[in-house]
């Protein structure tokens, strides 16, 4: 499956000057919500991702996503894997498990995002689950922006990667775009970064 074509066809590969939820600026933005608004395509992508995970022979009992961006991807992945799904969300800027969701002691959980940039949100989600006794066994995403090391990719982890090196990150593709710290962003000379993502919006 050509993941880049899926994003392009859904008009979900945006070009401009963007402020990512990680804090970096970039000339490209992946709007996964546009891809996932098609239920059949969402199912196909999740099945492809589930195949990678199943081939690794991991014991996964639950998928958890940080709201809002990861919810659709996580739910479809959980359905493809045949396990339950829960999500964490921010309350007063602190990631929290609410809505009656519970985790069992040593429950094996995969944390799923739509896009992984630095993995900061995924790690906030993982920390909440670990504090409640769960065991994080892997991370997943539809796409990886190339900062974190993806399983089966030749690319190495880059500066700013937050995910632990001993746990696998499963994603369908690496999307490697230029990213800049706000203090050294060349795009800021001609335009103001816009924030199309879900954190804070």
UniProtKB/Swiss-Prot annotation:
UniProt keyword Coiled coil present = no
Tell me the gene name: pyrE
UniProt entry keywords in alphabetical sequence: Glycosyltransferase, Magnesium, Pyrimidine biosynthesis, Transferase
What does this protein do, in the record's words? Catalyzes the transfer of a ribosyl phosphate group from 5-phosphoribose 1-diphosphate to orotate, leading to the formation of orotidine monophosphate (OMP).
Stretches that traverse the bilayer: none
The record ties this protein, via NCBIfam families, to: pyrE_Therm
The answer to whether the entry has keyword Kinase is no
Reactions mediated catalytically: orotidine 5'-phosphate + diphosphate = orotate + 5-phospho-alpha-D-ribose 1-diphosphate
Protein name as it appears in the record: Orotate phosphoribosyltransferase
PANTHER family per the UniProt record, alphabetical: OROTATE PHOSPHORIBOSYLTRANSFERASE, URIDINE 5'-MONOPHOSPHATE SYNTHASE
Positions with a binding annotation for 5-phospho-alpha-D-ribose 1-diphosphate: 113-121
Q: Recorded E.C. number(s)? A: 2.4.2.10
What's a Gene Ontology MF term here?
Answer: orotate phosphoribosyltransferase activity
Cofactor(s) of this protein: Mg(2+)
Q: Where does orotate bind?
A: 117, 145
What's its top-level EC category? transferase
Pathway entry = Pyrimidine metabolism; UMP biosynthesis via de novo pathway; UMP from orotate: step 1/2
Q: Which family does it belong to?
A: Belongs to the purine/pyrimidine phosphoribosyltransferase family. PyrE subfamily.
Q: Which InterPro entries match?
A: OPRT, Orotate_PRibTrfase_bac, PRibTrfase_dom, PRTase-like
Q: Name one GO biological process term.
A: pyrimidine nucleobase biosynthetic process
Q: Which CDD domains match?
A: PRTases_typeI
């Amino acid at each position: 499956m050509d993941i880049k074509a899926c994003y392009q066809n859904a008009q979900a590969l945006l070009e401009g000057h963007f402020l990512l939820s990680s804090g970096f600026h970039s000339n490209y933005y992946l709007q996964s919500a546009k891809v996932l608004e098609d239920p059949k395509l969402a199912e196909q992508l999740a099945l492809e991702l589930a195949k990678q995970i199943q081939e690794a022979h991991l014991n996964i009992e639950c998928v958890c996503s940080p709201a809002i961006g990861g919810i659709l991807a996580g739910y479809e992945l959980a359905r493809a894997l045949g396990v339950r799904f829960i999500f964490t969300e921010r309350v007063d800027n602190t990631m929290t498990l609410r809505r009656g969701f519970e985790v069992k002691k040593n429950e094996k959980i995969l944390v799923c995002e739509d896009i992984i940039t630095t993995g900061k949100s995924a790690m906030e989600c993982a920390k909440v689950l670990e504090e409640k006794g769960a065991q994080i066994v892997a991370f997943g995403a539809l796409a990886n922006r190339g900062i974190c090391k993806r399983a089966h990719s030749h690319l190495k982890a880059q500066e700013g990667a937050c995910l632990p090196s001993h746990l696998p990150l499963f994603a369908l593709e690496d999307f490697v775009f230029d990213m800049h710290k706000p203090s050294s962003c060349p795009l800021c000379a001609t335009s103001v970064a816009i924030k199309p993502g879900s954190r804070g919006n």
